[in-house]
Amino acid sequence: MKKVVKYLISLILAIIIVLFVQTFVIVGHVIPNNDMSPTLNKGDRVIVNKIKVTFNQLNNGDIITYRRGNEIYTSRIIAKPGQSMAFRQGQLYRDDRPVDASYAKNRKIKDFSLRNFKELDGDIIPPNNFVVLNDHDNNQHDSRQFGLIDKKDIIGNISLRYYPFSKWTIQFKS
């Protein structure tokens, strides 16, 4: 009987730990489309880290998952609170300076800036809001369609691709 009780206690503790980790630390996710191609492709399996969101550690270049209505999307942060941004002639400008990162240059994207966002009255991103962009230029499930992304809608940043095994990746910056 003591063994059964110990087993049940261990099982309950394991379930509590798993629930805690999935709620506050990390969660698995399957990429549902090719919006982030070629960086991430449909069917890739990734780990989403929730800690950076909780502690306000999201950075430009981070690939995040976020909710929009009932859907979950994956995009790259290109500008964060307190910054200005614009895309001109295929080049990302942040705070009026060209960004030197592979995701920011030679893009086949129509020119746009913060002035295109209806919900914004100026040229600076307000607190708790981000501008995101997909790596695949033709897929506009990002700020070009949705506008600013509120921090409360961000699930976390992608910190690891573990499948397919041949594309194992830990670092997704530029």
Swiss-Prot record:
Superkingdom to which the source organism belongs: Bacteria
GO molecular function: serine-type endopeptidase activity
Residues on Extracellular side: 29-174
Keywords annotated in UniProt: Cell membrane, Membrane, Transmembrane, Transmembrane helix
Keyword Phosphoprotein: no
SUPFAM superfamilies: LexA/Signal peptidase
Annotated TM spans: 8-28
Primary localisation category: membrane
InterPro entries: LexA/Signal_pep-like_sf, Pept_S26A_signal_pept_1, Peptidase_S26
Its membrane topology: Single-pass type II membrane protein
Location relative to the cell: Cell membrane
Chain ranges on the Cytoplasmic side, renumbered to this chain: 1-7
A single Gene Ontology CC term: plasma membrane
Keyword Membrane attached: yes
Signal sequence extent: none
One GO process term, biological-process aspect: signal peptide processing
Similarity section: Belongs to the peptidase S26 family.
Record function comment: Catalytically inactive.
Name of protein: Inactive signal peptidase IA
Organism: Staphylococcus aureus (strain Mu50 / ATCC 700699)
